[in-house]
Each structure stands twice: as C-alpha cells, then as structure tokens.
Amino acid sequence: MKFTLVATVLLTFSLSAFAVEYPVLTIASPDQVGFDSQKLHRLDGWIQNQIDAGYPSINLLVIKDNHIVLQKAWGYAKKYDGSTLLAHPIRATTNTMYDLASNTKMYATNFALQKLVYEGKIDVNDLVSKYIPGFKDMPGDKIKGKDKLRIIDILHHVAGFPADPQYPNKNVAGKLFSQSKSTTLEMIKKTPLEYQPRSKHIYSDVDYMILGFIIESITAMPLDRYVETTIYKPLGLKHTVFNPLMKGFTPPQIAATELHGNTRDGVIHFPNIRTNTLWGQVHDEKAWYSMGGVSGHAGLFSDTHDMAVLMQVMLNGGGYGNLKLFDDKTVAQFTRRSPEDATFGLGWRVNGNSSMTPTFGVLASPQTYGHTGWTGTLTSIDPVNHMAIVILGNRPHSPVANPKVNPNVFVSGLLPAATYGWIVDQIYGSLK
C-alpha cells in the first residue's frame, strides 16, 4: 500500500515536471520592455493625421517579451451610410471587431492545419485528392497535374490555380459560376490550371478555399465550428468568429467596410450583389456569395486582443497557458522559407527579401512572418525580437477613388496608412 502511494506521488510529480506551461500575455509599459515611450508616442500623432486625412480607422496592438505594451484605436468603425457621411459616426474602440480578410488564411486555416499536422492527422506531402474525391484533371484541361498536387503545393501557392476566378460573378466566371458552397467545390474541381504546377508562384485564394474543404473532410466539421470549438474557445477568445451577426454580435461591435456593397460605387454588377454598406458581413465576394461566409481564404472576424493571443501562440511555439495546440517543430515547418519563393513559408508570408518592406518595414528581423488582409489588416510576428504587431483597419470604408479607372482603389488606399511598413518601422525605431 505504501509502495503504491509513493509510486503514485512520484508519477504525479514526474508528469507535472514535464507539463508545459506557456507564457500568457500581461500588460507592461513600453519602457519596461525596452521601448523609448516618447518615440513610440510620436506614432499616435502620425496615425491621427491619417484619420484626419480620411483613413477610416486603425486598431493597433504591440507585443514585446510576452507583454502587451501598446493597444489603441483611432478613427471610426462606421462613418458612412452609403455615400453619406454620418452626422454622428461610430468611433472605433479597442474592442471593435474587424473583417480580417486574408489573415483568415493564417489564423483559421493555417492554425487548423498546424494542429492537424501536429496530431498526425494530415501530412503536407499528402495528395489533395486523398481528401477531395474527384480532384483530378478534366478531359479538356490544357495543363495537367491536378491529380498529383500535394497539400504543400497548395500552401506554397505553386499549384497552378488562378489568383481569383470570381466564382460568384457570372459575367467573369462563366461556366464556373457558383453562389452555393456545394456547387463551389465542384467548380473548384473544374477550375483549369493556369500554369504547370511548381513552375512559378501565383498567390491564389483558390488554394485556401481548397485547404478549407480539406480541413472539413478530415474533421467532419464545418471549418468555423472546428476552429471556434477546438482553438478559439479553449484559448478563451470571445471575439473571433465567422459570420458574427449569426453568433450573437451586433453591427455596432464591428467595423464597416465597403459603402455600396460589392459594387465598387456602382460599377460592378452580378446576381444577388449586395448594395448596402457592409457592416458585420464578410466583404470578400467568394467567401460571402460562394461559401456562405465561411471559407479557408476569408471570412474571419476578430479584435486586436484576440489576435494578440493567437500571435503569442506562435511566439510560444504552439501553446498558451496550459493549452498546447501544436509544437515548435510545427511552427518551424510552417514558417520556413519556400524554395520557390523566399517570401512564403507554408502559407505564411516571410520577410525573405526587400519586396516585403512595404509589409514588414526595414527593421524587422529576416525571420519575421505574418500576413496581410485586403480590408487593411496586418500581422507581424518576429521570433528574434520576441515581438508581434497587429494592425486592424477597415480601408474599404471610403469612396472608390476612380471607379471607372480602377474599382479596387479606394480613397483611403491612396494614403500612407494603407502601407503597413511605416507603422512597423516606427515601432521598431522606438526600441532603445
């Protein structure tokens, strides 16, 4: 009896000794972790000048050495109703939720894949066709190779798919037109390759739409339910969801985006196109019309605090507190530079050369990685300096500069605030 008790105590002690307890975020002043507060404060006035010049809003959070050292909001979550400036615009707060756009690729799809890889439920060298039946070359395809595509090819954006087939716009998509999720998967299978796989690099939303379907195939769960129940909820995240208006959130909690739906101020038309100011619905057309708001490439909403926790998971090597999602080897595997393009890991953008200066600035370490989102979002994670930055914005919440010349350039997109690197450099430049 005594031997059993002693053995039990020793076993319990041994297990607790090996239990992983990851750092959790706490609040600290900038000076406590090596910043010059006066230099960092200059950023405040510069961002406010951009808001005064017409940039809708910016939410910024900075992490250094496991501490949140700066969290602030500037501007307006909603200042327009259509083309009309509101008499009483809604100010952005540090709790405002934003449409992450392509940062969804990292903090929903990549996080899910990293977890599944760590658990041994998927290998990045697996064929896509293993998880998506019927994923193969079509009889009329000029470029062959779909049946040999691997998940790693999709993650590296070298699979051969076009950047944006515009499935919901029948005028552009033609026979690939789809405004339902079940049809969209079939249209993806039929989407012809534009180049021989692994011969060049084209960043493609289709790649991450495919990855979303693969995750659903493995987990037997919708993508949103999987990440919300197995990643976000265990981490204690309360403002990171797909389709927020269907999950208890209200428009005033969320930053608005395009003024006239997806029409780019009236120059784009297709069946069922939204024309009202987008407020709480994902902006991305493929995510909304073709995927019901939940896609591997876009659709996630979050705030800066929740994003800080997710970035800290990466800095920690895969966990937070007593929760382990994946390990440091998985983080290294996914953030390692691609042989085809040094600015890509497995999905993650990497600070691999000077072409990334507009994103990561000139002062971040070459090991820095993260992603951007079309709506005005940036995440930057620097493992060398143990530092991370998240910028959330609603750049499309302004008029289109010249709809007939380029419907994708908004007035706010012409301001310096539309480029993230200068903000990143000002933060790094404030280090002592």
Swiss-Prot record:
Question: What is the native source organism of this protein?
Answer: Salmonella gallinarum (strain 287/91 / NCTC 13346)
- Which reactions does this protein catalyse? Preferential cleavage: (Ac)2-L-Lys-D-Ala-|-D-Ala. Also transpeptidation of peptidyl-alanyl moieties that are N-acyl substituents of D-alanine
Q: Name one Pfam family in it.
A: Beta-lactamase
List all membrane-crossing ranges: 7-25
Instruction: Kindly provide the name given to this protein in its UniProt entry.
Output: Putative D-alanyl-D-alanine carboxypeptidase
InterPro entries, per the entry: Beta-lactam-related, Beta-lactam/transpept-like, Diverse_Enzym_Activities, Pept_S12_YfeW/YbbE-like
Q: Which family does it belong to?
A: Belongs to the peptidase S12 family. YfeW subfamily.
Q: Give the first-level EC class, as a single word.
A: hydrolase
Sorted alphabetically, the keyword list is: Carboxypeptidase, Cell inner membrane, Cell membrane, Hydrolase, Membrane, Protease, Transmembrane, Transmembrane helix
One term under GO cellular component:
plasma membrane
